[in-house]
């Protein structure tokens, strides 16, 4: 039980990225450009998929939701991080911290399972091409999108309830630039070993489960590709998966580094650097990975620009 003379924490302060003013300017300009590129790339991808009817297939339906999740997850972190760059007191309310943690956790878990849904879609497309339209019906696609959002919501509630039912009565300086779960738990006025163990177990189960779906899908995909007689056929089949594999490798590598490591190797400072990568850089990279390495997206982009140019040219003539 808490003593009456203990102070209940109503707000938290961030240590931020650096205390050097000159470095803050460089970081501010860098991550402002990264955030703008993230919004432009992901929202542009959503609009492109919506406008081009040739992209109205399951693969790009999932990609549009991935772009939405990336834009949202970046917007949960980046605006606050950028606004805190040049203020002495980087403060956030207790409720604001809970909301930021809730939203970011939701989008991260959702992205992991969206990538699993996309892996299953690639498996059906390559391994069962004749049954693709039958298996990947509109109903199934909607279910494969609702599922990740639902899993993200449930897992987020587990983490939020675990973290914010604890008493916070002493230190309120978070060694981070946003409200991440482990740094927040380290400030609780209670033994958090069980909570951290729960985080490790839940993160491990979610990561392993979604990872197994992706791994099994690609094992079957690899077996099918190896059975293709022509080298050109194998290359085309692999090219449809290369963008997805790149996105999966980058995201899962950073998440496992932070959340599924033994506690003996845990370091808040190292996590801060890695978190900076997966909260700001990865959401920016995904649309470029899928567009630069995907002929259909590049062709759709060219068609959209040509169509808009023709419309504007006709308006000028008329």
UniProtKB/Swiss-Prot annotation:
- Keyword Transmembrane belongs to the record: yes
According to its UniProt entry, one GO biological process term is: sensory perception of smell
So where does this one cross the membrane? 29-49, 57-77, 94-114, 145-165, 199-219, 240-260, 272-292
Gene Ontology CC annotation, any one? plasma membrane
Q: In this UniProt entry, which residues form the Extracellular topological domain(s)? A: 1-28, 78-93, 166-198, 261-271
General function of this protein: Potential odorant receptor.
Name this protein carries in UniProt: Olfactory receptor 5G26
Query: Source species, please?
Result: Mus musculus (Mouse)
């Amino acid at each position: 039980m808490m003593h009456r003379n203990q102070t209940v924490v109503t707000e938290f302060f961030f240590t931020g990225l650096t205390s050097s003013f000159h470095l803050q300017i460089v970081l501010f300009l860098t991550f402002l450009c990264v955030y703008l590129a993230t919004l432009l790339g992901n929202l542009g991808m959503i609009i492109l998929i919506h406008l081009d009817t040739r992209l109205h297939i399951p693969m790009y339906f999932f990609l549009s939701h991935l772009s939405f999740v990336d834009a949202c997850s970046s917007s949960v972190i980046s605006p606050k991080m950028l606004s805190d760059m040049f203020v002495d007191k980087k403060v956030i309310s207790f409720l604001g911290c809970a909301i930021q943690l809730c939203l970011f956790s939701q989008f991260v878990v959702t992205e992991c399972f969206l990538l699993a849904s996309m892996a299953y879609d690639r498996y059906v497309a390559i391994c069962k091409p004749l049954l693709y339209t039958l298996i990947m019906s509109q109903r199934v696609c909607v279910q494969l999108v609702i599922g990740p959002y639902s899993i993200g919501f449930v897992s987020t509630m587990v983490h939020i309830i675990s973290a914010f039912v604890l008493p916070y009565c002493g230190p309120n300086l978070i060694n981070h630039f946003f409200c991440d779960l482990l740094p927040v738990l380290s400030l609780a006025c209670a033994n958090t070993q069980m909570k951290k163990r729960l985080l490790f177990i839940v993160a491990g189960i979610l990561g392993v489960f979604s990872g197994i779906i992706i791994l099994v899908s690609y094992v079957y995909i690899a077996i099918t590709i190896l059975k293709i007689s022509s080298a050109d056929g194998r290359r085309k089949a692999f090219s449809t998966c290369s963008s997805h594999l790149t996105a999966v490798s980058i995201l899962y590598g950073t998440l496992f580094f932070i959340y599924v490591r033994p506690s003996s190797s845990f370091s808040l400072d190292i996590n801060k650097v890695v978190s900076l990568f997966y909260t700001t850089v990865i959401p920016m990279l995904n649309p470029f990975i899928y567009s630069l390495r995907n002929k259909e997206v590049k062709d759709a982009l060219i068609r959209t620009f040509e169509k808009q140019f023709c419309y504007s040219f006709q308006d000028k003539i008329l």
